[in-house]
Amino acid sequence: MTTRITARFTELAAEGRPGLVTFITAGDPDYDTALSILRGLPEAGADVIEVGIPFTDPMADGPAIQAAGLRALKGGQTLAKTLDMVRAFRDENDTTPVVLMGYYNPIYIYGVPRFIADAKAAGVDGLIVVDLPPEEDNELCLPALDAGLDFIRLATPTTDEKRLPAVLAHTAGFVYYVSITGITGSATPDANAVAGAVARIKQHTTLPVAVGFGVKTPAQAAAIAAGADGVVVGSALVEAVRKTLDEDGKATVNTVPAVTALVQELAEAVRGVNRAAAE
C-alpha cells in the first residue's frame, strides 16, 4: 500500500521540484492555536508536516523547540491530545502527509500496540523517533511498518558507510538527513556539503532524502533544497510562534498568521528550485 508520504514525494518528483517539510510542536502555545496552525500549513505551501510530540527531555532539540515543548506541556498537551490534533486535521485534509516526531518514552508509556493502532486510526502516516536506534527495531519500527506506518530514520554527518546500511534497512517514506552535528536550530548547514552527503546516501537507497536541522531562512531552504528531495524547517517556525506571544506566553491574533506567512515565504523559495536544473 502506498502511503501518503510516498505518494507526495512521487508527485514532487514528477513536478521536478523538492518539497517543503514543516515542523510544529503539538499544543504550542495551546491546543486550539496549534490546530489552527496545523490546518493552515498545507495552503501556505507545506508538502509534508511533522508534528512534534512534547517531551520533558528532548535531547536532540535546541532551545527553541525545547521551549515550545515546555509551553505545550504546561498547557496540558499529551500524546493522546496530539493524536486528537491529527484526527481533527484529517477531518479537513486527507492528502497532506503527517509525521509524528519525538522520543520513545511517551510512546512506551502510552503502550506501543495501542499507540500504533491509535496513530493509524487518527491519520498519522509516519514516525520519527530520534532515540530508538536500528538495534531496537523490534520495539516500535517493525510493528509500525507492519501496520502501514512509515518509519523514518535519521542519518547524520557522522553516519559512515559501515553504519548507513543498518540505518536504512527498515527506513520507509523518506530518509531524514541531519545536516549538522548538534541540536536543532543551531549552526547553519553548508549547501555543498549537504548535496554531497545526500548523493552518498542515495547510493544506498531509492528513498527520497529530506534535509533538516539549522535551516532558518527562505534563502537557506532554497540552497539546501537544490541538493535534496526535501528540506525541513522547524525551529524557525517555532520561533515565529514564540515571538507573537503576549507577556503571559499566550497566543495573540498574530500567532497563526506569522507562522503561515513564513511558510509561504519558505514554500515560494523552495518551489523556485528546479531539481532537473540542479542535477
From Swiss-Prot:
PROSITE patterns the record matches: TRP_SYNTHASE_ALPHA
Listed Gene3D superfamilies: Aldolase class I
Transmembrane segments: none
GO molecular function terms attached to this record: tryptophan synthase activity
Enzyme class name: lyase
Keywords in alphabetical order: Amino-acid biosynthesis, Aromatic amino acid biosynthesis, Lyase, Tryptophan biosynthesis
Active site per the UniProt annotation: E50 (proton acceptor), D61 (proton acceptor)
Reactions catalysed according to its record: (1S,2R)-1-C-(indol-3-yl)glycerol 3-phosphate + L-serine = D-glyceraldehyde 3-phosphate + L-tryptophan + H2O
Catalytic activity, EC: 4.2.1.20
CDD domains per UniProt: Tryptophan_synthase_alpha
GO cellular component: cytosol
InterPro entries in alphabetical order: Aldolase_TIM (IPR013785), RibuloseP-bd_barrel (IPR011060), Trp_synthase_alpha_AS (IPR018204), Trp_synthase_suA (IPR002028)
Pathway named in the protein's UniProt entry: Amino-acid biosynthesis; L-tryptophan biosynthesis; L-tryptophan from chorismate: step 5/5
Subunit structure: Tetramer of two alpha and two beta chains.
Family label: Belongs to the TrpA family.
Role according to the record: The alpha subunit is responsible for the aldol cleavage of indoleglycerol phosphate to indole and glyceraldehyde 3-phosphate.
PANTHER family membership: TRYPTOPHAN SYNTHASE ALPHA CHAIN, CHLOROPLASTIC, TRYPTOPHAN SYNTHASE, ALPHA CHAIN
Protein name, per record: Tryptophan synthase alpha chain
Protein source organism: Azorhizobium caulinodans (strain ATCC 43989 / DSM 5975 / JCM 20966 / LMG 6465 / NBRC 14845 / NCIMB 13405 / ORS 571)
Gene: trpA
